[in-house]
Amino acid sequence: MKIAVGCDPNAEAYKQELITYMRGLGHEVTDFGSEDVIYAHVATKVGEEVAAGHFDRGVLFCGTGIGVMLAANKVKGVRAANVNNVYSAKRACLSNDCNIITLGSQVTGDMLAKELISAYLDCTYVYNERSGKKVDAINDYDNAR
């Protein structure tokens, strides 16, 4: 799977460890950097790349994961979720067809982050009657703006 990643400067070491982990799982990972202190810039860049179909998924990092989630969700076609437990990481994919997850380097330890990333990347969204209509409604709103 092709994965786009990025972070703010505070999460650089965290991101590097998790890039190594994702590559070890066999994923092709492209790093969009961490130099810009305005995390919205890297989050929207990753969002644009994922929404354009250049990458299968995205993973973003900042202190809490909330800021990069908010910024990425401003990009048309992005459905980003901040995840902090394995169930939510799986459901982000299975129920919500999220194409980006976000994690907080200051609130999620390295081992848990690896579990969350694996849970998310191991899932495939399959349209179904229950969740599909909800995702369609989100996409309809997104396409209307």
Regions found by a protein language model. Give the residues of each.
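Helix-termini ("caps") and immediately adjacent flexible loops/tails
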Residues: 2, 13, 30-32
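Glycine-rich phosphate/diphosphate-binding loop of Rossmann-like nucleotide-binding domains
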Residues: 4-25
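Helix-adjacent hinge/juxtasegments
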Residues: 46-83
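C-terminal binding/interaction regions
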Residues: 4-6, 10, 86-145
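SAM-dependent methyltransferases
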Residues: 1-2, 23, 46, 143-145
